[in-house]
């Protein structure tokens, strides 16, 4: 069994190994917390600036609590946290799609070389199924790529 504290630099895809600043999307859920923890170990060893970003959607009663959790967790890790409250207005695709669009608008404001966003296998399946239901072509049906451009300077990485 491997120790998570030995998270290797080789886990970064080739195109990301020269990143000097990684920002981790932090929802407060298990996936994003584990990713931030692992990146904090890696950043210290590789002299990478690490920050986190939290998007406060206000869609759940617990939204303020998630923000406070993220603030506290980032404080324990000594990782600066950028957060933004957004207004989510449901559109024709639904509230979840509107929340995702708002999240990616905030993510796109990063100055980092890489924005890391955790996901799990169910996220990939959900993305594939939604694309299939919408009649997506081959590109849409490939679900979420591991690395793609987020903006002119930042790559989005989904480990």
Question: Where are the language model's segments positioned?
Answer:
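Core alpha/beta nucleotide-donor-binding catalytic domains of modification enzymes
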Residues: 1-159
């Amino acid at each position: 069994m491997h120790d998570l504290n030995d998270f290797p630099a080789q886990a970064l895809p080739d195109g990301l190994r020269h990143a000097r600043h990684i920002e981790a999307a932090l929802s407060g859920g298990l996936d994003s917390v584990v990713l931030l923890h692992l990146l904090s170990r890696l950043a210290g060893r590789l002299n990478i600036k690490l920050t986190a970003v939290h998007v406060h959607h206000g869609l759940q009663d617990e939204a303020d609590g998630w923000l406070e959790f993220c603030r506290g967790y980032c404080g324990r890790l000594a990782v600066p946290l950028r957060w933004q409250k957004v207004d989510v207005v449901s559109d024709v695709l639904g509230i979840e799609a509107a929340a995702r669009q708002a999240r990616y608008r905030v993510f796109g404001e990063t100055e980092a070389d890489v924005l890391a966003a955790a996901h799990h296998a169910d996220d990939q399946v959900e993305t594939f199924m939604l694309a299939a239901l919408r009649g997506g072509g081959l590109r849409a049906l490939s679900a979420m790529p591991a690395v793609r451009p987020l903006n002119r300077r930042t790559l989005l990485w989904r480990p």
